Amino acid sequence: MIPKIIWQTYKTNAPPKRAANNIKSWTTHNPNHKYRYSSDLQCEAFIRDYFDKEFIKMYNSLPIGVMKADVWRAAIIYQFGGIYADLDTECRGPASLWIGEDDSLVVTVENKSGAIGNYIFAAIPKHPAIYSVLESFIEIYQSDTFLNKRSPTPVQDFGAHGWSIGILKYYGLNKPEIMEQGGEAYNKYAKVILDRVRFYTSESKILSAYPNENTLVYHQTASVFWLEGYESWRLEQERQLGVFGV
């Protein structure tokens, strides 16, 4: 059974005001779940307490906060299990509507390429597929492309790209399968939310899907649409462009 814990994070001890209603939506719709919020300092302490020196070195070397947050979310769910949700996700119904008693891993597909999204997911502790994701982060960190700062998409490498690499590797899937079958290829192994209305994100609009009364999770894509009182990771990435020479 996936533990009834909701995990969220932001750089400071206090989340941005724009996230207040979203946080409330998760606790209101899931009163039987524990809620856990971690600042950057708390995330760093967790990584330091639970992982080995190589993993800590990788984590500390990441130059942009969102990259560390991407690693932390996989690490915290691997260690304790539960639900991870970005602060810019609104919960519109109980998690029990999309997490079954026998589920061990629940993920969603971001787009037609079959990339696994990491803005929301749920798993039991020590799930081997999540461990594979953590291994993929180490492999990316140790690659010549990353070490020589030649990656054109360093943030994505530790986001949906790295996440998908780990999941694909664990389940023995490959890109041609995913391109042909989309998210259906994953359903042999884990519950995958494919309905872009039930799990709505900004990309869904491009695919002519819109949120309605059946939408359970609404990803508001803060890095694009939130402005006042919220600093997008995209701005931090712009300040750090020289780090990767892109």
Language-model segments: residues:
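Glycosyltransferase-associated regions of secretory-pathway enzymes
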Residues: 1-69, 85-246
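Small-residue hinge/turn detector
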Residues: 70-82
